[in-house]
Amino acid sequence: VNILEAARQNSINRISHASSMAAHSFLPGSDSLKTLYGAYKMCDEQISEVYWQDHKVPSMCLRPAIVNGVGRDQGMTSKQTVAMLAAAFGEPYDIPYTGNVSHLSAAEVASAFIHSVSYDGDGAFVFDIFGESININETIKMINKIKPNSKITSSGSEMPFPSKLSDT
């Protein structure tokens, strides 16, 4: 809200902000989201829509899936990157989830944000950025290919988010 209000007060003609694939994590047969984080991100998206409706503050919201790479060391979805770092240092690491997950590089997501802020649009737009859906066991195989005999494992439940959606 603070960024949108600052944009309104200072006649800024476009902003770009991040949501998350967690905004898609609805409980089966329900309008309720599975996670507080997903509800928070969905709320941000709706606030942007209202700022466009009431104040004509345009915005571009991107919903990246799991981002891997430099700078990803916080939060549940950073654990693949943490595993890569552990392998590089020869340390064991257990990725605390299983199943299929989307893979995006930090560089491609950064590029999407840079391009999104350069777009002049009339509205509050939301776009998904999902990348390739890969089973976490395949990720571990890729890590082992680069760093043989790494001690990377995975356990736990699947992530409560979709692993693949269209990038639209």
Label for each model-derived stretch:
Residues 49-101, 108:
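NAD(P)-dependent short-chain dehydrogenase/reductase
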Residues 3, 40-48:
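Conserved catalytic Lys-bearing alpha helix of Rossmann-like short-chain dehydrogenase/reductases
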